[in-house]
Amino acid sequence: MDQSSRYVNLALKEEDLIAGGEHVLCAYIMKPKAGYGYVATAAHFAAESSTGTNVEVCTTDDFTRGVDALVYEVDEARELTKIAYPVALFHRNITDGKAMIASFLTLTMGNNQGMGDVEYAKMHDFYVPEAYRALFDGPSVNISALWKVLGRPEVDGGLVVGTIIKPKLGLRPKPFAEACHAFWLGGDFIKNDEPQGNQPFAPLRDTIALVADAMRRAQDETGEAKLFSANITADDPFEIIARGEYVLETFGENASHVALLVDGYVAGAAAITTARRRFPDNFLHYHRAGHGAVTSPQSKRGYTAFVHCKMARLQGASGIHTGTMGFGKMEGESSDRAIAYMLTQDEAQGPFYRQSWGGMKACTPIISGGMNALRMPGFFENLGNANVILTAGGGAFGHIDGPVAGARSLRQAWQAWRDGVPVLDYAREHKELARAFESFPGDADQIYPGWRKALGVEDTRSALPA
């Protein structure tokens, strides 16, 4: 059934829809299956996303038609479809009238992902008007709270040097806590890796008690505040709360030094909202493990990493992993800095829409995945700032002189970039950074050719056979 007469209105202008403030706008890259027309398929897509079905039904009235989602722009050559969703379509909490990502996704990314006439459709951007945006929680705290704990300025406080304890699984409580202590002697922030939680060989209660003690010892030894991000992910909201309460109680006087990590993609919006509302004074660390199943450029369905991170800010994540923008080991491009800008700025340009956040707190980019001291200056140069949390696992524990030197090398790389000093020049006066070149010679050869001569390091590579 061709529904284009009802669900398509190409006379609508985007600027008028934005000025009206009554529609959520979504941009999809969509391709119909062979034999289906583009506009007719886009209309069916909008119908399935809102008030329609595959046949006319007798219960439809004028009010129903007034809240139809409407296709307002198509560009078949670019496979672009833009749809306007009336804000009234998205349901709200009965307890407080707040909006929810669950409803947003059910409409914009629900049944339309399994339609028989659509070969693929992926959301690349969305726009929320002020009245709807204000119904979301947004972050309660962000990196400014961590800078305050660290004794830094709460604006432009710079890089938080962090790591992930490796191996990601297999450490029992005592060696895990000792690894934390070792890194904290040189670094700021440690996070649970996303699978770490309450394994039989590493009960959460035992591990957290030892980590809290390791933090106290490291702070006493260095005279510096330290930070820990504890994984409280669970299926059951009551389990999330129980874990969070135990963690904060155990850290005691250092409870403000604790972030609470939730695997937001796999555990879902309910887990993020539970943590955001139950623990508003603590940094909510949104890990996105599993997101690549839908956000990867190789996937033509679902939504992009940009969309995922934008939703995280609405939900109230204090920080979310954003990848390394092509400077680490994970998928990414230098242009992914647009994700960081959308998370941190009060008004930012996305792939299709310019979004105003109306004063909503920023969400902090968290950087991980193959980063080390040698890769960091290029990353900062591409981003334009260093106001991020770095969690470098191999970059710290893979340092030739151990995790303390690894942590210091990461900090020194940031300081070199901050001060505008070439990394090799800075390394001549900072041994931990210099030894990072020997720790990661493959990266050093690629990024800093000639580093051995510059640092006076003997070239021990075997000569190639003639």
Swiss-Prot record:
SUPFAM superfamilies for the chain: RuBisCo, C-terminal domain (SSF51649), RuBisCO, large subunit, small (N-terminal) domain (SSF54966)
> Which InterPro entries does its entry note?
RuBisCO, RuBisCo_large_chain_AS, RuBisCO_lsu_C, RuBisCO_lsu_C_sf, RuBisCO_lsu_fd_N, RuBisCO_lsu_N_sf, RuBisCO_lsuII
GO function terms (MF aspect) = magnesium ion binding; monooxygenase activity; ribulose-bisphosphate carboxylase activity
Q: Which residues does UniProt mark as catalytic? A: 166, 287
Keywords for this protein: Calvin cycle, Carbon dioxide fixation, Lyase, Magnesium, Metal-binding, Monooxygenase, Oxidoreductase, Photosynthesis
Instruction: Locate the site labelled Transition state stabilizer.
Output: 329
Q: Which residues carry this modification: N6-carboxylysine?
A: 191
- EC numbers listed for it are 4.1.1.39
Known cofactor(s): Mg(2+)
What biological process terms from GO does the record include? Answer: reductive pentose-phosphate cycle
Membrane as a keyword of this entry, yes or no, is no
Where substrate is bound, by residue?
Answer: 111, 168, 288, 321, 368
Query: Residues that bind Mg(2+), according to the entry?
Result: 191, 193-194
What is catalyzed by this enzyme? 2 (2R)-3-phosphoglycerate + 2 H(+) = D-ribulose 1,5-bisphosphate + CO2 + H2O; D-ribulose 1,5-bisphosphate + O2 = 2-phosphoglycolate + (2R)-3-phosphoglycerate + 2 H(+)
Query: Which superkingdom?
Result: Bacteria
Pfam families xref list: RuBisCO_large, RuBisCO_large_N
Tell me the cofactor note: Binds 1 Mg(2+) ion per subunit.
What this chain does, per the entry, is described as: RuBisCO catalyzes two reactions: the carboxylation of D-ribulose 1,5-bisphosphate, the primary event in carbon dioxide fixation, as well as the oxidative fragmentation of the pentose substrate. Both reactions occur simultaneously and in competition at the same active site.
Into which family does the record put it?
Belongs to the RuBisCO large chain family. Type II subfamily.
Q: What else is known?
A: The basic functional RuBisCO is composed of a large chain homodimer in a 'head-to-tail' conformation. In contrast to form I RuBisCO, the form II RuBisCO are composed solely of large subunits.
Q: Which NCBIfam families match?
A: PRK13475.1
The annotated subunit structure for this chain is: Homodimer.
Name the UniProt record assigns to this protein = Ribulose bisphosphate carboxylase
Organism of origin: Rhodospirillum rubrum
